[in-house]
Amino acid sequence: SDNNASSGGAGDPWILGTTDTVTALDPAGSYDLGSSTLEYNLYQTLVTVPPNSTEIVGDAAKSCTYDDPTTLTCKLNPGEKFSNGDALTSADVKYSFERAIKIQDANGAAIYLLGSITDTAKDGTVTLNKGAIETPDDTTVVFHLDHPDTTFQYVLTYPGAAAIVDQDVFPADKKLADDQIIGSGPYKLSQYKAGDQAVLELNPNYTGPNTGKAPQVFVKYYTEPSALKLAVQNGEVDVAWRSLAPTDVASLKKDSNVTVATGKGSEIRYWVWNLNSGIGKQAAVRQAAAQIIDRDAIAKDAYDGTVDPLNSIVPPGYGGANEAFKTQYGAPNPAKAKQILKAAGISTPVNITVGWTPTHYGPSTEDEANEFQRQLESSGLFKVTLKSTEWEQYQTIYKQGAYDMWILGWFPDYPDGDDYLSPFMVDGGFFANGYHNAQVNKLVAQEQGTDDQAKRQQIFGQLQDIAAKDVPFIPTWVGQNTAVYGKGMSGVESTLDPSFIFRFWLVTKSG
């Protein structure tokens, strides 16, 4: 009953420390990890993904099922309420999508992730398709998609695109102030000061499957990783999560007062080839570089072993992930690379300009760029000119052909292999690198158009194999999901998975 939830709470309040920043706590205005960390705990989505899984389960909805590849019907749990006692009905669900699309915040996710139910005009204005969301009764929501898209169910797990808000509290045409927000998640917001701290307490009206244990959770925000390291060492915070420097993690492993826990990650780094340039256009050049790269050395020398080598663009832990680059190229082998270039009649050394950005992905990016250059040049087959540019300009000029090759990173929007394939491989990808392959486009349309997961995963494998042969990019590493915690804490390990959802409801403190 409701009474159990309100009197619930096991053990003591605990404190999370992080260097992540929050853009907004109104889901209509955020598309970043710092914001979604709080949103996952304060709001419900229709469906969600349990720890260490990519299987979708109900959250506010009992179920969301495809009637056909363009129709998704969601059945809400009866009697749902927001933390203020208001009933949560299908009307609130519809309103949540309508307002996010109407507000169209530049920092929001709705305009990027809800393409299956929206239309984009030439001037960039996004509107909800007529009849896209129907509510035949208080507990039923039907989505009509404008093309077959089985990834839409995964988008529904992400609060930035699909958190359910109270239509009587959130304005239709502008964002609500952060400290005013109301949700229906396991916790409710009791205090918030941007850049300083958030205070969450148990939501007494929560009836879902993820009832919180701790009566209160505090989130403290730090600007420097070094300050976060000190805070967890001296007990100022109970858990430090995102982001400690690789050297700090290494030294904390030697501190007996804290535990360093790691789970599978999903953040990746990869180098993109420019197929519009005379050099990058040549498949043999791209393949030769792929034959030389030593991922183990990059992980060890540039990142102190705090990341894992990545042998395909889809990381381990995702259905359908393989090790296509390892299968295709085996161990790093400059002699084989020389043969590839010789067979194609390409004279060596090949001169390439390689771009990287110094702050956006952290200080170790420079170490990776230098290691990348060292490996390619020590083969005797490449002459590498490194060029560094700050992020603001970098993301414009890499699309304009400034480099033959450049580094990028990726965090997934939803826990499905498609999110590492379609944005990267269809018609030049979001990074506009000039790669086009008709077979790729056909395969992506096939996997997005079926709900048969075995078939989709088989296609994911084919796409990864094509990527390893064509080499439009070279993946280098996948991050770990790392947290450091003090004495008396339990449950931290169980939330460290590739989704990067920090599930406050799983964590307790005693003593």
Locations of the language-model features?
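Gly/Pro-rich hinge or "lid" segments in bacterial periplasmic/extracellular proteins
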Residues: 148-212, 216
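Detector for C-terminal structural segments
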Residues: 293-321, 364-373, 395-511
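A structural "hinge/loop" feature
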Residues: 18-39, 60-62, 86, 150-162, ...
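N-terminal lobe/hinge region of extracytoplasmic solute-binding protein
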Residues: 17-68, 98, 182-183
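Alpha-helical secondary-structure segments
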Residues: 88-98, 138-144, 185-186, 214-216, ...
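Surface-exposed binding/hinge segments that line
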Residues: 65, 73-75, 94, 109-165
